[in-house]
């Protein structure tokens, strides 16, 4: 038995085997060590060969590869796919930001004074140009924005929230829990399906700091229901001398096609309606990097900047550089550089051209049909819009697994597996054809 164990390959020799030439060496060594230790602990008999060991290491390494971040082809049709990284960034915008991200910069350095500067100054200026707000601030995500705003203005004070807006977002993060941890005191008003202006008005007292309106971006209440508009809330808070805050979740610029803008708040219009402070995610409909964008009155933003917690939530030069390029693309009307918006605006005929190109060049049996999809990212949950799908013959679950194995993430609809071209980029088409034909040759 010991003789058999002595024949096991040496750890330091494994990376040199031809089977492992392109493997990530540190992980390979760690995984190989675990595999060899397991073989020894199980007292494998003398029949184990070097090839058996290599196969065991390969299988174990495959598990590591599954968790390693890698590019995927999103063929689900959901453009802002939370599990697939939300909004993709344009390669052109990344190129424009690369030099700044890889150099020293005046991130917090005043070129005119030679002293410490404001890291948010340039981004704030761009956001003021884009939205017409008084001032702006950036933190690392919208949950951080909610926390910072509540902690700054409502610590140990009451915040009025409609029961119909006490939402839970992804990963079990709930508005009531965020409020509790921020130091704010939640005061629920109205009912789940109906909240009236009088509910807010009758609940304001000397300990009320603000009214928080939470946009129902990842669910909707239909039927016998009503809510109070932010315009009416703004008038009430101004009259009663308290703040109003709109947690928008996902903000967009201008308009959206396919009637997606209907009943979906537009950031610029909200600013004009008299909202004191707004926050939303940078990597949802805005189509940029993960961050929390806060817009509001100058004195309120200044108070947020003076909160010591901001240092824990601040963003780095990488985030600011990419965000700046995104905002400039909007200001220059280079909307084709905002990848999610570009995909949303594609016509059915454009998507059909892509689908036909794939169908005409693959060996698997499939058909093109019109379908419907959703924007995703916790936005517009009840608003589907048209798309084009390539539907494949055969067992849907087996097809889904096979495509996923090769990095193409599709979806199943009515017991058929399909690739939805609403979320497929033009430069993915050739790769999709190559992958599908490779699968069919197996």
Swiss-Prot record:
Record's keyword terms, sorted: Cytoplasm, Protein biosynthesis, Pyridoxal phosphate, Selenium, Transferase
Localization, UniProt: Cytoplasm
MF (Gene Ontology): L-seryl-tRNA(Sec) selenium transferase activity
UniProt modified residues of type N6-(pyridoxal phosphate)lysine: 284
Any one annotated GO CC term: cytoplasm
Cofactor(s) it depends on: pyridoxal 5'-phosphate
EC top class, as a word: transferase
GO biological process: conversion of seryl-tRNAsec to selenocys-tRNAsec; selenocysteine incorporation
Catalytic activity: L-seryl-tRNA(Sec) + selenophosphate + H(+) = L-selenocysteinyl-tRNA(Sec) + phosphate
Annotated S-S bridges: none
Pfam family, one: SelA
InterPro entries per UniProt: PyrdxlP-dep_Trfase, PyrdxlP-dep_Trfase_major, SelA-like, SelA_trans
EC number: 2.9.1.1
Coarse class of the protein's main subcellular location: cytoplasm
PANTHER family, per database record: L-SERYL-TRNA(SEC) SELENIUM TRANSFERASE
Family listed: Belongs to the SelA family.
Function of the molecule: Converts seryl-tRNA(Sec) to selenocysteinyl-tRNA(Sec) required for selenoprotein biosynthesis.
Protein name: L-seryl-tRNA(Sec) selenium transferase
Name of the gene: selA
